């Protein structure tokens, strides 16, 4: 009789705190699947690696594994690297591994982000006094990727947060790979005339990049003393994030887990990336 297990595949980080946070998310996912073994592993930079997590599930008798990428958006790691590891393992050990999709643009993820931002607003109001959101600029900082589809999703989420919460304006920056980077983004925002700026890293976990985002925010506060710069907490293990992970697992069993490939540079001739069609 076939036995099913769940595998959460993370990128990995050199930050032990980030690695620990990912493990907590994987642990909390178990509450949604109390009868199913759940394990996790990382693509690089940390242990256990994905193969170790798969070994653990196989040792528990699992021969059918539902694997999901522990990532916000689908770029190279979620589209290429993790599937390569999973397919190689499945072929070697003769088991069935089905792969789900990334967290993506989802109402639950936007709700989680809004909660983090609202907590930052409340903290700013307690620190400096009440201020209208119409007089506040939201800055959403994404990871940044070589995939324009993933980058554009950060902009979409930022706009939905701005319009949904009522901010006067929103700007988007990235920690790497694409532009604008964090420091020039904050310099630009300082010229827009807003007296308060909320900086929200749209990241799942902490790490060097989140630390840098907060560092650039502190530097901007020093450079522009007339503006209130408030840092928001990243997503981490917000209950809505865990719910989204659980939904991605369930999608595999219902056959509704396909990634949106309409704007994937590996599948279609996306403007400026025509030469990368078929590289996946």
Regions found by a protein language model. Give the residues of each.
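Active-site-proximal alpha-helix that buttresses catalytic centers in soluble enzyme cores
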Residues: 1-280
């Amino acid at each position: 009789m076939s036995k099913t297990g769940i595998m959460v595949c993370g990128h990995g980080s050199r930050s032990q705190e980030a690695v620990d946070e990912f493990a907590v998310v994987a642990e909390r996912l178990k509450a949604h699947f109390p009868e199913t073994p759940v394990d996790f592993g990382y693509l690089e930079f940390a242990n256990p690696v994905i193969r170790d997590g798969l070994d653990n599930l196989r040792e528990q008798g699992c021969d059918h594994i539902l694997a999901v990428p522990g990532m916000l958006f689908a770029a190279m790691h979620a589209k290429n690297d993790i599937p390569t590891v999973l397919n190689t393992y499945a072929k070697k050990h003769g088991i069935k591994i089905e792969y789900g999709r990334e967290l993506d643009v989802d109402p639950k993820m936007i709700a989680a982000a809004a909660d983090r931002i609202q907590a930052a607003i409340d903290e700013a109001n307690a620190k400096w006094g009440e201020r209208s959101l119409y007089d506040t600029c939201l800055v959403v900082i994404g990871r940044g990727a070589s995939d324009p589809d993933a980058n554009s999703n950060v902009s979409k989420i930022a706009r939905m947060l701005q319009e949904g919460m009522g901010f006067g304006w929103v700007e988007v920056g990235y920690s790497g790979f694409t532009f604008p980077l964090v420091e020039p983004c904050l310099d630009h925002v300082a010229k827009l005339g807003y007296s308060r700026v909320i900086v929200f890293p749209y990241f799942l976990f902490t790490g060097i990049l989140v630390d840098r985002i907060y560092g650039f925010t502190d530097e901007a506060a020093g450079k522009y003393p007339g503006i209130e710069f408030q840092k928001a907490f990243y997503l981490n293990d917000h209950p809505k994030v865990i719910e989204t992970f659980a939904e991605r697992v369930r999608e595999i069993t219902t056959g509704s887990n396909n990634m949106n490939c309409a704007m994937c540079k590996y599948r279609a001739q996306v403007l400026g990336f025509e030469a990368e069609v078929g590289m996946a």
